Amino acid sequence: MAVGKNKRLSKGKKGLKKKTQDPFARKDWYGIKAPAPFNIRDVGKTLVNRSSGMKNANDALKGRIFEVSLADLQKDEDHAFRKIKLRVDEVQGKNCLTNFHGLDFTSDKLRSLVRKWQSLIEANVTVKTTDDYLLRLFAIAFTKRRPNQIKKTTYAASSQIRAIRRKMTEIIQREASTCTLQQLTNKLIPEVIGREIEKATQGIYPLQNVHIRKVKLLKQPKFDLGGLLALHGESTTDEQGQKVEREFKERVLEEV
């Protein structure tokens, strides 16, 4: 009888699973901090792989963009239809310091604004802020009935639409190009520009639902750590106190 390897006995058991490792064991949680214009500064948490070898966790976090509802940032449900984009520019400890990266409307809000019997007017302007951020702002507006109007429709003439669009462009250009990104964010939150357009176009055709529906960041200047820390209420300066010199007084020991 030939002595050989019994293939049946040497085979391993079928269906043996490899030892699974928890993927979250190699990850860390980092806090997301919103900049100064917003009321709620702690946005949430984000996961990232721990630093190992040549891979640094901070490099993986920088440049991440988070979309947050403005209602959560301002603690006001009236802003629920607007979404703010925040970009991670710096990581300090376990905190991601973010800056404003853009604004957008929810699709359901945009769809609810479009109705019959009215004209829709849109305009977009590319502007540069005083701190060299290149932005594109998209505005939207709708015509409304004049006081005591009997006619059902509120369609504006082509010449009126052109005049309104020209006015919208002028106001956006003026309001955005004369301020910093932080000041512009402060204007966007309470919709100052939209109200300004509505007021300025009353003589041409009355408008309603005037909004800056989208803000797109096209180009940003060279990264400034001091400016970012100022947005987050921190400072790069050394805040140690100065040494105060006092006159030396010799202590006289009393004789016992």
UniProtKB/Swiss-Prot annotation:
Residues 1-18 have a biased composition (Basic residues). GO terms for biological process: translation. PROSITE patterns: RIBOSOMAL_S3AE. SMART domains: Ribosomal_S3Ae. The modification N-acetylalanine is found at residue 2. Its main location: cytoplasm. Pfam families: Ribosomal_S3Ae. The keyword Lipid metabolism does not apply. Residues 1-22 are annotated as: Disordered. It is found in: Cytoplasm. Transmembrane segments: none annotated. GO terms for cellular component: cytosolic small ribosomal subunit. The keyword Cytoplasm applies. One of its GO terms (molecular function) is structural constituent of ribosome. Keywords: Acetylation, Cytoplasm, Ribonucleoprotein, Ribosomal protein. It comes from the Eukaryota. Component of the small ribosomal subunit. Mature ribosomes consist of a small (40S) and a large (60S) subunit. The 40S subunit contains about 33 different proteins and 1 molecule of RNA (18S). The 60S subunit contains about 49 different proteins and 3 molecules of RNA (25S, 5.8S and 5S). PANTHER family: 40S RIBOSOMAL PROTEIN S3A. Belongs to the eukaryotic ribosomal protein eS1 family. This is Small ribosomal subunit protein eS1. It comes from Pyricularia oryzae (strain 70-15 / ATCC MYA-4617 / FGSC 8958) (Rice blast fungus). The gene is RPS1.
